[in-house]
Amino acid sequence: MRPILLQGHERALTQIRYNRDGDIIFSTAKDQHICAWYAHNGERLGTYHGHQGAIWTVDVDPTTTIIASGAADNTVRLWDVKTGKCLKTWDFNTAVKRVEFNEDATQLLAVTEQRMGFLGTIVVLDINLDVNGPQSDDRALTITCAESKATVAGWSYMSKYIIAGHEDGSVSQYDAKTGELLFNTQVHEPDLQVTDLQWSPDRTYFITASKDKTAKLVNARDLEVMKTYVTDTPLNSASITPKKDFVILGGGQAAMDVTTTSARQGKFEARFYHKIFEEEIGRVRGHFGPLNTVAVDPNGKGYASGGEDGYVRVHQFDKGYFDFTYEVERQARQQ
């Protein structure tokens, strides 16, 4: 797997997203702009300028018409993908750490930071998919996280629940219509934050990554932990691969703790685990610092990782990846 190296950011990457077709990658970093790239050759499609602080998060609607971003300038912005025009800006009291469209992109959730006396919240905004139409200023729903602030959040299948990961290592399930807290489960070790939450293709289960050096596969309906992937380094990101039963984990020794260690000692690799058997099956090296974000092509043909080193590395899976099977998997096919 020879990677395509994308050099468009001057500072550490914060999030990467593929569009639903898997042909465009959107990346955000701490350098105040969003980049769009063609996934197959790494050509830069364009950049989106307007934020005045580090951009923490980005998401794209299913039709690749609009993207949303959240940043340290306390705003959520909506952009026209084709023209790069900023369609709408929503202001908040604190930084926005995560945005995600629901399945039909009629709503957008935003996770705000707990800071300066303001509690962390999850806010739902109504979205108009017509780029020439008006956008509403109103918040459709506000969930206040009084116990422990939310660090990540997303929509479950059919936009039925909002699932949030918290700073104290717990995961919550909220009713997406009313904002009522339905479940709260201590998925990770207490006081080690959930750093990422990404969905299976059908959104019935999700994977979380945490500073406790594990990733967990969790059922969205009752927050039951189905699988646990144990590593030897704090994790920043985790993703589920379609087509094959794998998960990809990214992390590494925290950037502030890295002194003169080699890349190998820092454990700056993307790790592949078997989704069912919970065993590590391979690693991909390359970044000169922790991996902050990993994302998988929705078609299952490749993945991209973004690091503290400011690079995005896009990998296309080769034949060996698709051919790899366990003995029990081969036997099951033959029967």
From Swiss-Prot:
SMART domains: WD40 (SM00320). GO terms for molecular function: RNA binding; translation initiation factor activity. It holds the Pfam family EIF3I. Its main location: cytoplasm. GO terms for biological process: formation of cytoplasmic translation initiation complex. One of its GO terms (cellular component) is eukaryotic 43S preinitiation complex. PROSITE patterns: WD_REPEATS_1, WD_REPEATS_2, WD_REPEATS_REGION. It is found in: Cytoplasm. Keywords: Cytoplasm, Initiation factor, Protein biosynthesis, Repeat, WD repeat. WD repeats lie at residues 8-47, 50-91, 145-184, 189-228, 286-325. The keyword Repeat applies. Belongs to the eIF-3 subunit I family. Component of the eukaryotic translation initiation factor 3 (eIF-3) complex, which is involved in protein synthesis of a specialized repertoire of mRNAs and, together with other initiation factors, stimulates binding of mRNA and methionyl-tRNAi to the 40S ribosome. The eIF-3 complex specifically targets and initiates translation of a subset of mRNAs involved in cell proliferation. HAMAP family: eIF3i. Component of the eukaryotic translation initiation factor 3 (eIF-3) complex. This is Eukaryotic translation initiation factor 3 subunit I. It comes from Botryotinia fuckeliana (strain B05.10). The gene is tif34.
